[in-house]
């Protein structure tokens, strides 16, 4: 009986232990089920996330493809822009060289213009000097003409005196013929008259020589005036030529200034175009 009780107690204890183990196993089973459900949820969530990631990956790959295409287009546009910039730089360099040559031509034209102006001033000064000389020569000619008139007047006066002396001599000769008896007393008078006649003759010859020299000087002055007049005409012609040269140079200077303004405007337009291009490139 005791053995049965012990056995029953042992069986009860074993039952209790079994119940405890069963409860424990049930609890573990619940926990395992919970973990399984949680794992399934996590797996579902992971699958959903993987699907989302795959979708995101497809979107990213598509966006990457578009970005690569856009980048290639940008690279191509950048290469074209760099080529255009290089071409524009070459054009700018050529324009700068043209501008330098234009400035050199402008400086040369300015120098030539200054030289031509100086030559024109010198020609004007020479013309004024020649005019003054011409006026001085005209004054000298007037003085010579006055002297010539005076010499002619003296010659005419000498001729008149000579005629008067000749008339007196004729009268004396007539008186001498009528008064031969008074020849001795009138001899001294005749000598005086002959001396006066000789003096008058010498004066007349001197006046004739003076008149001839005056005529020679007059011819020389006329020739000198003619030479000076020719020189004056030549100087005026050179002055007119210099003035025409100055006008041509001035036209050349105006043309170069217009060309320089056009080049500057072209340079500004190119610079603005480059700035706009750089701004567009910076915007990308």
Swiss-Prot record:
Superkingdom: Eukaryota
GO molecular function, one term: protein homodimerization activity
UniProt keyword annotations, A-Z: Acetylation, Allergen, Coiled coil, Muscle protein, Repeat
Record PTM N-acetylmethionine, positions in chain: 1
Single Gene Ontology BP annotation: locomotion
Coiled-coil regions listed: 1-273
Biased composition (Basic and acidic residues): 12-38
Tissue spec: Expressed in muscle (at protein level). Expressed in abdominal muscle.
Region (Disordered): 1-42
UniProt cross-references to InterPro entries, sorted A to Z: Tropomyosin (IPR000533)
SUPFAM superfamilies associated with the record: Tropomyosin (SSF57997)
Keyword field contains Acetylation: yes
Function description: Tropomyosin, in association with the troponin complex, plays a central role in the calcium dependent regulation of muscle contraction.
PANTHER family: TROPOMYOSIN (PTHR19269)
Subunit and interaction comment: Homodimer.
Stated family: Belongs to the tropomyosin family.
Note on domains (UniProt): The molecule is in a coiled coil structure that is formed by 2 polypeptide chains. The sequence exhibits a prominent seven-residues periodicity.
Protein name: Tropomyosin Mac r 1.0101
